[in-house]
């Protein structure tokens, strides 16, 4: 049976005995919001020792300083309102941060906004409808985006149902 490198890594983790895995809590960070989508997707940047967290409650990207993992602190919070609707995902590679933002309505084409690891805006590009997941290529030169293309609710007349797509750039 042939396995890919990623598959081999996955299998070696799955096959490891439970006793070999030991997770300990190092620290916590609270947004101060309860029962809201205040922290959904996160991405770590080793260069800056920062954690980038999508905050759906405030439609922002929260940047946490985790150089001391026992005491994470809020470094910056970036409003994503200028880029469209709801924040959906974040990815980081070599100090470059990409954030997927849906349009309003979600059936329109969304945006990927780029920032440096301090939160300074660099650029933004239009992608397909409802960009939901994004990841940098291993060499960090491109971003792959999964655009869900979900329809509006049935109560909308006429119903708009955009195609799902993949964007790369």
What are the language-model segments listed below?
Residues 1-2:
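Bacterial N-terminal signal peptides that target proteins for export
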Residues 6-17:
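C-terminal segment of classical bacterial N-terminal signal peptides
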Residues 19-169:
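Mobile, glycine-rich extracellular loop/lid and propeptide segments
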């Amino acid at each position: 049976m042939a396995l890919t490198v990623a598959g081999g890594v996955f299998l070696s983790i799955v096959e490891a005995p439970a006793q070999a895995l030991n997770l300990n809590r190092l620290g916590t960070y609270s947004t101060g919001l309860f029962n809201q989508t205040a922290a959904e997707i996160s991405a770590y940047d080793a260069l800056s020792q920062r954690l980038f967290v999508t905050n759906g409650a405030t439609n922002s990207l929260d940047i946490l300083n985790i150089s001391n993992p026992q005491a994470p602190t809020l470094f910056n919070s970036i409003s994503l309102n200028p880029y469209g609707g709801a924040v959906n995902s974040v990815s980081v590679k070599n100090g470059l941060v990409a954030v997927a933002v849906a349009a309003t309505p979600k059936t329109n084409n969304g945006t990927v906004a780029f920032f440096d690891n301090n939160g300074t805006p660099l650029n933004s590009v239009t992608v397909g409808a409802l960009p939901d997941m994004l990841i940098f290529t291993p060499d960090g030169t491109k971003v792959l985006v999964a655009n869900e293309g979900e329809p509006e609710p049935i109560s909308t007349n006429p119903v708009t149902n955009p195609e799902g797509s993949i964007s790369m750039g």
